[in-house]
Amino acid sequence: MAANVMEIYGSKVFNEHVMKERLPSATYKSLEKTLHKGAPLDIEVANVVASVMKRWAMELGATHYTHWFQPLTGITSEKHDGFVSPVGDGTAIMEFSGKELVRGEPDASSFPSGGLRATCEARGYTAWDPTSFAFVKDDVLCIPTAFVSYTGEALDKKTPLLRSMNALSNQAIRVLKLFGKDVDYVSTTVGPEQEYFLIKKEDYELSLIHISEP
């Protein structure tokens, strides 16, 4: 059973292990800078990543892809498109470009905006977040994305987090440089945490007595 778990764990995730194994060395190194240092993503790199990601997903049975995002509804949303592109002679080819990987355009009027924009400004964009690994689920390649309005306002729960992490990195780098540390990027990790402390009942009751005293 344990061996089976190890075989299937992460088997449908386009993680760094898969990237390093399948991407050309130069492409992987460039993408690695984006992942770990926040470097801008070159469109040529995105084209190569998209092609490799499509082949990997198709090997796992995927026929469609979706930009997967978290709008202000409290649940995830998806906009599905197919890899299949019909051609003039009645056949079809499988396509997936860097542009399609990097950006999508769902109808933002279907989602809450907190009054950030007029109802006529319905256009919204999904933008690939390469720091969250793509994965295959139910024969669909799911690409984690941020969701913003056409003027750049956050329409989801991920964009404020990514912007906060970037701001924290910039300020942490300033502090570290004061201490002589030359770094390019500071990674932050967040997650729910709950701690419980066990103390003796008599100590708890004693603390209540002290608190109640004037």
Where are these predicted regions, by residue range?
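Flexible loop/turn segments at secondary-structure boundaries
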Residues: 50-51, 73-75, 101-104, 134, ...
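Charge-rich interaction surfaces and accessory domains that mediate macromolecular binding and assembly
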Residues: 119-186, 192, 197-200
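Residue-level detector of conserved catalytic or cofactor/ligand-binding positions
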Residues: 207-214
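Catalytic pocket of metal/acid-base enzymes, prominently hydrolases
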Residues: 1-13, 17, 21-28, 123-144, ...
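Histidine/acidic residue-rich metal-binding segments in metalloenzymes
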Residues: 4-12, 17-98, 102-118
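Residues forming well-ordered secondary-structure scaffolds
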Residues: 26-29, 60, 163, 167, ...
